[in-house]
Amino acid sequence: MVGPNVVFDVMPRVGAPVQIGLIETMRARDGRVPWLGGHLARLKASLAALGAPEPPGDLADLVRFAVGTGDRVVRLQLTDGHPEIATRDVSAEQAVHVVVASEVHKPYPHKTTRREQFGRALTDARRVGAHDAVLVSAEGFVAEGTAWNLFWWEDGSLCTPAEDIGILPGLGRKRVMEMTDVKEARVPVAALAGRSLFLTNAVRGIVEIGVFEGAPVPRDPRTAELSFAFWPD
């Protein structure tokens, strides 16, 4: 089994300039990475869209080697065709306290290392005692969390910010949309008041928001049902 916090620098380079990288963050469960093919397909699509070089080896084999047999968070970064894999422990799931970021959301269609807007939003959220933040577009529409996609229940329907706002369509978001009907919407922050909210990503699955902008968030039993079914057998 691979150690608790390991970095594999698969193809070391000496004196290489710092460049933008593409990243995929995955969850290993009992040594298996759900949606590994989806992660690598998204990575390949971003490589093509950005005109970046592909790695010379099989990334799937590298990820499996890094995972070992346990439950891990796996971060794959690819810069100029050079892969690096890091693993860490899985944090405990809990309802989170989320605030609205003052940082204006800029379109983020590819999962790259250019994540400064999310870093600033997360730092500001932690400064006021929150776990995370939701960013809002320049047009005033709720966009996404710092490493999550957002969902909410509204009049019997499950909703999520529309992809054309410029969000990263995460694999956790895709999984939820495979499990149930979801309405993509463009809404202001005020539209979330009193709604039951949750976040998703491919590492922690579904995590309920317990407090939003200082107000308790009502729970919806349908969220627990989705959470139970989220991870494939």
Language-model segments: residues:
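Conserved alpha/beta cores of soluble small-molecule-handling proteins
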Residues: 1-134, 138-141, 164-167, 173-233
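Glycine- and Gly-Pro-enriched alpha-helical subdomains that act as flexible
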Residues: 142-163
